[in-house]
From Swiss-Prot:
One of its GO terms (molecular function) is tryptophan synthase activity. It comes from Campylobacter jejuni subsp. jejuni serotype O:23/36 (strain 81-176). The gene is trpA. It comes from the Bacteria. The alpha subunit is responsible for the aldol cleavage of indoleglycerol phosphate to indole and glyceraldehyde 3-phosphate. This is Tryptophan synthase alpha chain.
């Protein structure tokens, strides 16, 4: 199983993008320049028609990608053309995996250099079949923990976790306001008592000020909605500059 610590030094810069937004050409050009960016780990959002965990901005981006014909096959074709030293993680809804076939999907993802899967709507209790395939192909199925998750459930969730722990810093959908820093610090301490895996904080982190604050709390910071916003205007040079601004030290 991949050790995500090898992809960053002091703190991980984790970004999220919707593949195919604002168009396939921009996505591909961005991925070709990924190694020149401050991003250590990139979550690749696979567009889905019912993105229940996503806020309006990401949901709209997914719709635009879908309207242009971006599907799981074009995602795989795109990634086959990409070579990068950075860690790639799929953020994908379970129905897409199930429809493609669990083993077939995980095997294909592994062949394309994917290190891990994040499946936001899949509960721990329903994840056995996917865990089995991920273990077979040495891909991490990422565990999500909320600040509101009770301690005993945290212990249960992280016991067999792989890759990293995704700590949801806000309650609800992506792009919403983050909870108090002190609450997050307490949750990180609680999680650390059960696992040595790195803990990355995401949801509600909107700008460089937020990133700098969260670096003091966790091992990595995940920025989603604000990164997707950078892509709206479509100019790659501006996109790269905006991403550098979000993650600057």
């Amino acid at each position: 199983m991949v050790d995500f610590r090898k992809f960053y030094k002091e703190n991980a810069n984790v970004a999220y993008t919707v593949l195919g937004y604002p168009n396939l050409q921009t996505s591909e050009a961005f991925l070709q320049r990924l190694d020149q960016s401050p991003i250590d780990i990139l979550e690749l959002g696979v567009a889905y028609s019912d993105p229940i965990a996503d806020g309006e901005i990401i949901a709209d981006a997914a719709k635009i990608a879908l309207d242009q014909g971006m599907d799981i096959h074009s995602v795989f074709e795109l990634l086959a053309r990409i070579k990068t030293k950075k860690a790639l993680v799929f953020m994908v809804y379970y129905n897409l995996i199930f429809s493609y076939g669990l083993e077939k999907f995980v095997k294909k993802a592994k062949s394309l250099g994917i290190c891990a899967l994040i499946v936001p709507e899949l509960s721990f209790e329903e994840s056995d079949d996917l865990i089995k395939e991920c273990e077979r192909y040495n891909i991490a199925l990422i565990t999500l923990v909320s600040v509101t998750t009770p301690k005993e459930r945290v212990k249960k969730l992280v016991k067999h976790a792989k890759g990293f722990i995704y700590l949801l810093a806000s309650i609800g959908i992506t792009g919403t306001k983050s909870v108090e820093e002190a609450i997050l610090q307490d949750k990180v301490k609680e999680i650390r008592s059960f696992t040595n895996l790195p803990i990355f904080v995401g949801f509600g982190i909107q700008n460089n000020q937020d990133v700098k604050r969260m670096r003091k709390v966790a091992d990595g910071v995940i920025v989603g909605t604000s990164i997707v916003k950078c892509f709206k205007q479509g100019n790659l040079d501006i996109i790269m500059k905006d991403i550098e601004e979000i993650f600057k030290k």
